[in-house]
């Protein structure tokens, strides 16, 4: 036996038989015999194979032709693969629906994951430190707004969604009543904190899981990894809806007074919407979910609206809140206020080796 293709065990007689049976086209011979169809894509055997076929057909190799060589044997330049990934396209920035307003109003930016978020809004005579202090005082004494659209928003839905979340969070989410919220910690397989956020139960089989800004894609992937690899027969579906909603935090002792100036169908009173509950309806003619949650320690509401209505709501809030001293505040003011309240921040109080007990969160 005379071997031509050592990977697919094609012999000289196989090629000669192909020619005898009428496979004169080199592409037909290739598929009839599997000559050159292994991982080398013919680079190790096709030249000799073409010579054998040409002899069997009584014609020169040029007349027989060659087959098409395919990757991965034929190398590609990196420029072919990544030519567009340069300059601004190297790492595209993610912007919230309210980004343009922040830019027009003097926001000083900081990177948070792939997002750009306002660090502060310095005025003409202020440095960033002075701006942060002013924003904090404005929220503590009156009312402020924070663009929280970057926070992760993952829908978990299905008959097994409750027990699935019980496996991922340190506390029980299956017992959370519809209409209420619960703070959740998520740990990795070693018990170290990896993310946190407020979980809201939307219906009997649907939960909305808020994640950190930088953790949305990672946590969604974490969920899918467990679903697809370990609990593949559970009836659960997840969807990352982070960019489909704009979310605005309205915080401060005058937060309720501000929101009540806008027409809407949601009762914002403390009795109708107590802490850690949410309600759905409309505000200023915009469909919305309003969560009575706080990351500042002050009276606070987070309002989620369709992304294309986020700027509209933000501008309406600032329009009706001028006499209340409404002030936009950035991430640094948020950091200071949450630290004063004693709330943790993933990445600040955690470093990949922190467990809940280290932070006094064994209750969560």
Where are these regions (language model features)?
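Noncatalytic alpha-helical scaffolds and linker/capping helices
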Residues: 1-27, 35-47, 60, 87
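Glycine/proline-enriched, intrinsically flexible loops and inter-domain linkers
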Residues: 7-9, 21, 32, 48, ...
């Amino acid at each position: 036996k005379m071997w031509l293709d050592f990977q697919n065990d094609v012999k000289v007689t196989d090629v000669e038989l192909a020619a005898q049976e009428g496979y004169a086209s080199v592409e037909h011979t290739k598929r009839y015999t599997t000559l050159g169809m292994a991982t080398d894509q013919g680079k190790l055997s096709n030249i000799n194979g073409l010579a054998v076929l040409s002899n069997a057909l009584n014609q020169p190799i040029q007349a027989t032709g060659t087959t098409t060589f395919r990757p991965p044997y034929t190398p590609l330049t990196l420029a072919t693969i990544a030519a567009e990934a340069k300059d601004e396209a190297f790492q595209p920035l993610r912007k919230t629906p309210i980004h343009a307003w922040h830019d027009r109003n003097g926001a000083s930016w900081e990177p948070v994951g792939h997002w750009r978020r306002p660090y502060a809004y310095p005025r003409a005579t202020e440095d960033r430190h002075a701006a942060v202090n002013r924003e904090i005082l404005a929220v503590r004494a009156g009312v402020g707004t924070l663009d929280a659209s970057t926070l992760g928003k993952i829908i978990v839905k299905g008959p097994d969604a409750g027990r699935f979340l019980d496996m991922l969070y340190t506390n029980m989410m299956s017992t959370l009543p519809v209409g209420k919220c619960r703070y959740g910690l998520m740990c990795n397989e070693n018990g170290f904190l990896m993310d946190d956020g407020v979980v809201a139960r939307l219906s009997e089989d649907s939960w909305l899981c808020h994640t950190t800004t930088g953790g949305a894609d990672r946590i969604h992937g974490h969920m899918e990894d467990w679903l697809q690899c370990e609990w593949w027969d559970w009836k659960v579906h997840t969807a990352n809806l982070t960019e489909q909603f704009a979310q605005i935090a309205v915080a401060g002792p005058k937060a309720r007074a501000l929101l009540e100036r806008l027409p809407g169908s949601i009762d914002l009173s403390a009795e109708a919407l107590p802490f850690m509950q949410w309600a759905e309806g409309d505000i200023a003619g915009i469909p919305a979910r309003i969560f009575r949650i706080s990351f500042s320690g002050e009276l606070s509401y987070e309002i989620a609206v369709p992304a294309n209505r986020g700027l509209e709501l933000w501008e309406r809030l600032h329009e009706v809140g001028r006499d209340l001293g409404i002030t936009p505040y950035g991430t640094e003011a948020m950091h200071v206020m949450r630290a004063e309240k004693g709330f943790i921040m993933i990445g600040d109080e955690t470093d990949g080796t922190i467990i809940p007990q280290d932070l006094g969160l064994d209750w969560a």
